[in-house]
Amino acid sequence: MHVSIALQRDALSALCRRFDIARLDIFGSAARATDFDPARSDADFLVKFKSDADEFSRFADFQDALGALLGRPVDLVERGAIEASRNYIRRRRILEEAQEIHAA
């Protein structure tokens, strides 16, 4: 995980508690850190909500809050969508490189 993300781990966990997040993982270049450009790269996250209640609104609000906290664009993907993906290559790649940020 890139150091700029790792330094925000406590703040990310607090944000997850505020938005009732069951699990948050980072993947992509921010997880690999080898090809992450702090000036230009976005951050990719897998999210799992504790409940389905008003999930659409929370999804957008959580994505905005993540971007504001990290000061960069954020791509947010529901973990269940990746786990259920029929594209096994993409599914395996994302799940293998994902690094846990928060679990409740």
Question: What do the predicted segments below correspond to?
Answer:
Residues 34-35, 39-44:
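A short, structured beta-strand/loop element
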Residues 46-48:
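Short hydrophobic/aromatic beta-strand micro-patches
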Residues 1-25, 31-36, 50-104:
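Catalytic core of pol beta-like nucleotidyltransferases
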